[in-house]
């Protein structure tokens, strides 16, 4: 994602992102916040929502924001690597394991990089193998999805419609708890 975003530094980061309430810079700031928020929760094994400081310094330019994104991704990756598989921490979609935090972070990074690309008219190609793993981990309630993995991930995140499947509304959700705990029902139903 950083390899895609860094060359866009000179573009208009205040450009709106289609179908979001944020512009490109606000979407980038959200990405930075999610990585730190996930890391803080998993590292602490909190059973409740933490009041994690989430606002990136408003004075940072795009280069500074991208550096922060890289740093926050690295912190989260280290926390995930060091967490035992049985670790759990709070997320509004349930007590989440390291694999769930990893999948949520990947979903955020892939989909919001795609969003930023749309806002800047610079198409971002989601990697199919990673998209498939994220879909199978976070969205077991909708499997199988008979389409390309990148389109499946975008559909699961409410970004596109698929043949025979209308675009999901803003209240879509994912399964962040261990897949073994899923009872076969749609958590949003």
Question: Language-model segments: what does each one mean?
Answer:
Residues 1-8, 25-44:
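Alpha-helical bundle segments that constitute or directly flank the non-heme di-iron/ferroxidase center
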Residues 7-16, 20, 40-52, 64-71, ...:
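Structured surface interface patches that mediate subunit assembly and partner/cofactor docking
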